Amino acid sequence: MYHSRLFLTNGVISVELDSLNGEVLGFIRESTMDNAAKNYFRDAAGILDGIVYVDNAAKHLNVPRFPQISEDASLTPKITLEQGEGSGKAEIFYPYLVANGEKIDISAKVRIELLPGDCRSRWYLSLDNKSGCEIQCCKFPQLNGLWLGDDWKENTLIIPRVAGLKMDDPTGTLAEPPVRMTWKWQEYLHNYFLGSQPATKDDRGLYEMKVNHTGGCSMLWMDLYSEAEGTGIYITCRDRDLRQKAISACTLGPYNPGVGLGIDHFPCLTEGAWESQECVLAFHEGDWHWAADEYRVARQENPNPVCDNEPVPEWFKKSPGLVAHYDFMYQGGKVVHTFKDIPALYEKAKSQGYKHLLIAGWNDHGFDDGFPLYRPSTELGTEEELKTAIADIKADGGHVCFYVNSRLCNVGYPQNKERTEKSCAMNRDGSLKIENYGAKGVDFATLCMSEPSWRKQLVEDITYLVKEIGIDSVYLDQLAMATSVLCYHPEHKEHAGDPAAWNQGYEKLLDELRAAVPECPILYEGCCDVFGSGVAAQLISTIRRPAVGAMAEIYKYTFPEQILTDMLNPRRYSAMRAEHTARKSTWLLYKSFVIGSYFWCYDLEEDNTFSRDRSQEERMRKTVALRQAWLDRWGHGIFRDREDLLVAGELVKKYDIENGVLIACAECPGYPREGNNVVLKWNRSKKVKITMLTAENLTPVVKKLKVKDGFVRLNLPQTELALFAVEEL
């Protein structure tokens, strides 16, 4: 008997497969009877979608479909189903795949498992390459045309891009024409996207957002959910090796709706066998918090032995933030401050509530120019002047951090020629990977951290800065923000035959740094779970994406014990940042406060400083003081987002603390007040002690309340910032 579809179920999830080629035609949550795979993307094959290089030309690698199979029966896959009592397994063997529709000698085996009573489906892929062509990347599993419920516009997609990106109506949003503006600062032309983060349209008409892990992608999962339906779809790869991968979301747009979700692997396989690690597609109730909880548990079961459990110094835990000075030597040799200015800059920071300075542009040829020439610039003063200034700050209980770029090598300096040739990441065609920042003609080679001599030099340079110059923290720019790359350099023996070893190089760097200077906390740009538990703080830079759905709560909730740092910006005199960013100055400040971020306060003379914006400086000073009181009295706490908060605005967040919870509240001027109360679900005691602090009054106001009907109601004072500690009695 002919069956057009093959069915697999465990009573929780059902999967429907095309009986001819094994593609997924149905992905169903049985409790709602909703098939999420509602639209078949005709021109974009599902289940497996890769790139293979044939005669050095990139071609789409897919499973064969009816037109190819009808012409060549040897392409017919063998599909085996095992339907048990409350469980099921499918195995699909493809003797050949197709590259741009043409048969290629690459076989694939797909295995799908549904375990009893489990909302998670497990997916596995193995490849055998006999073609002699390189399989560079492979998206698996790839399910297309997804939406939940009746209306795709009511769906929301969570992508952990730089801590988190929330995208309503992803079908429409991914296909929107990008709205871009340019802001000029010095010789930098900063591009900002407004309204949505743009996707890239490929030759099949697919709008795709692809983010590498590491490099933009903070965690290896996505979640598509519908608040109207109360359900969601979660996708991840349980990546035990933490190798370079990517997540991607795609659509054909609102006139051909639905979203595709996939995990990108990078086999870089020219011959032989390759196997994926376990991937998961799951249905769940509720919103993205289920997905974050699920991912956290899986990562805790698979800790990174290189980067996990790095102790953060007590001084850093008690510090509210730092003041960042990029205005020593700018690109092109423009000098604002010298080493003799450091004591005065520290005193100014102290007046704002900070005792931690970050200094960039301290090195030969300055910021965004003299990389990696990491010795103090003699144009800024003597080494002794620098040492003395730092020693005096430390004697006062302060701290100094130096900016170091972990990625770039200026190709314009003759002394960098050998480093460039030896350590630069190389494209597949043998060309060097080159990047540009700032002025036209200032070009940088992208250095491969899996090249040992570069890693050794960087560790030695930072060790010198700690042991000789006296800094007690270091910031590694671009480490987890700039995209990871594939390196095909034939002389990089440490990762020979493995172009996708980017993450492993940085794991080794951080491990070697901690061994060399264990007393020096590490901060870096970007945010990624591969390295995050092994550093003091991760810079998320919401300031660059305030208008495109940036949502740092996603990472903070998933890994609440890790410290995020975020940039603050004055309302006026914001030459460094665009006007639409400056208009969100207070929102950025208060958002950083309620999610417990380590403040990153710029102080660039005339270009970006709170000291010329007196009213906003006073607002920041009060916020920093309240944050300091929070840390001194309760510590960081464990971030729980809006858990158990039945009535609360966007800028109200909950933390677990010893013997109770802490609630951080903010009201941003210019935004509508979201009510006068916060209602907390409480079943821990019949009475509670409430301790309140505000930005205007750091003296605790304490009262005791009876718990009524399992709830605690907090009346918000007429103030912009407040903290409530609710503790059991």
Would you name each region that the model predicts?
Residues 706-729:
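C-terminal beta-strand-rich structural cap/linker in extracellular carbohydrate-active enzymes
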Residues 102-104, 117-191:
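Acidic (Asp/Glu-rich), glycine- and aromatic
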Residues 2-99, 111, 151, 163-165:
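Acidic-aromatic substrate-binding/catalytic surfaces of carbohydrate-active enzymes
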Residues 415-444, 450-453, 503-614:
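Glycan-recognition surfaces
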Residues 216-221, 643-686, 690-693, 697, ...:
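Carbohydrate-binding surface patches
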Residues 320-460, 467-473, 479-492:
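Aromatic-lined carbohydrate-binding/catalytic grooves of carbohydrate-active enzymes
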Residues 7-9, 188-313, 339, 577-586, ...:
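Beta-strand-rich recognition/accessory modules
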Residues 589-664:
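Aromatic- and carboxylate-lined catalytic core of secreted/periplasmic carbohydrate-active enzymes
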